[in-house]
Amino acid sequence: MAVTAALVKELRERTGAGMMECKKALVETNGDVELAIENMRKSGAAKAAKKAGNVAAEGAIFIKEENGVAVLLEVNCQTDFVAKDGNFTAFAGKVAAEALASKASIEELQAKFEEERVALVAKIGENINIRRVQFVEGTALASYRHGEKIGVVVAGEGDAETLKHIAMHVAASRPEYVNPEDVPADVVAKEREVQVEIAMNEGKPKEIAEKMVEGRMKKFTGEVSLTGQPFVMEPKKSVAEILKERGASVVTFVRLEVGEGIEKAEGLSFAEEVALAQKG
């Protein structure tokens, strides 16, 4: 039996799976929709597809390091409970190991582990997403994980303890750049415009406002850069001062936090659930 667009549409509506997945299932069953559904249920594809619409904003950051290269991987799920599940952590660890071994892109990792991901979704009943991967290279690397939620890798020069402490600082203080001079010109220009407007709205003449802004801009670039921030373990000193004292330096760093940029779905209140039930 020929696999028609109508059959593919029917299978998609009944399983919630993707078009190509449905077409493949129908080709394998010679157009038999019922058998295709049965096969997809057995493989977990139908169940996984239904879970795919669920927001996966929990999860964990995984770090692996070898021969001067470190990989940070974010894998998401829907609940903190599953983020600690052995099946989930084993899957993510396998993905991270492959990323480190092959320097694979996120798209390559997603494609390579799609079948295993689908099977795991079917097994644990939550949507799972291989979301982000980043690499850091350097002669001296230090990593730090704060629980499962935040992962940091720092590359630089210096003793292991100092670089580890810097990684902990990055986890806590969220710097965006290494040095104040690394802040992009467009970011500086945009912030300057805002600060000039604020100063002028305070009733200051433009020439005075401009001078005030210079001080504010220095503060701004310091706040968003690692070396300009007060060191979390010795707040009276900047990170730059700590690095100088210890004969260390930072070349680059990467900080990943679970769920950054993912919009979590708001749960319904009890009253909203009752109202919705009455409408139904």
UniProtKB/Swiss-Prot annotation:
It comes from the Bacteria. It is found in: Cytoplasm. Keywords: Cytoplasm, Elongation factor, Protein biosynthesis. InterPro entries: EF-Ts_dimer_sf, Transl_elong_EFTs/EF1B, Transl_elong_EFTs/EF1B_dimer, Transl_elong_Ts_CS, UBA-like_sf. GO terms for molecular function: translation elongation factor activity. Transmembrane segments: none annotated. It holds the Pfam family EF_TS. CDD domains: UBA_EF-Ts. Residues 79-82 are annotated as: Involved in Mg(2+) ion dislocation from EF-Tu. One of its GO terms (cellular component) is cytoplasm. Associates with the EF-Tu.GDP complex and induces the exchange of GDP to GTP. It remains bound to the aminoacyl-tRNA.EF-Tu.GTP complex up to the GTP hydrolysis stage on the ribosome. Belongs to the EF-Ts family. This is Elongation factor Ts. It comes from Vibrio vulnificus (strain YJ016).
